[in-house]
């Protein structure tokens, strides 16, 4: 069984755990509608992504 040669310092342990923190989601402002949306996601209100119509909304 593998055993660590040295004790992990609190600093190194904290640096390892820093990736586990919950980060606040980032938002980008849509150039056409001005709405906030997640980066690399399409705008659900208009159905546009990178200037192209991707989603066609149904009339109901």
UniProtKB/Swiss-Prot annotation:
Keywords assigned by UniProt? Ribonucleoprotein, Ribosomal protein
Q: What GO terms fall under cellular component here?
A: large ribosomal subunit
What segments bear the compositional bias annotation Basic and acidic residues? 17-44
Give the protein name, as stated in the record. Answer: Large ribosomal subunit protein bL32
- Where are the stretches annotated Disordered? 1-60
* InterPro entries from the UniProt entry: Ribosomal_bL32 (IPR002677), Ribosomal_bL32_bact (IPR044957), Ribosomal_zn-bd (IPR011332)
Task: Report the Gene3D superfamilies cross-referenced here.
Answer: Single helix bin
Repeat found in the keyword field: no
Recorded coiled-coil stretches: none
In the UniProt record, what gene is named as encoding this protein? rpmF
Q: Where is the composition biased (Basic residues)?
A: 1-16
Return the Pfam families for the record: Ribosomal_L32p
Q: Which HAMAP family match?
A: Ribosomal_bL32 (MF_00340)
The Gene Ontology biological process terms listed for this entry are:
translation
- Tell me which family the UniProt entry assigns to this protein: Belongs to the bacterial ribosomal protein bL32 family.
Q: Name one GO molecular function term.
A: structural constituent of ribosome
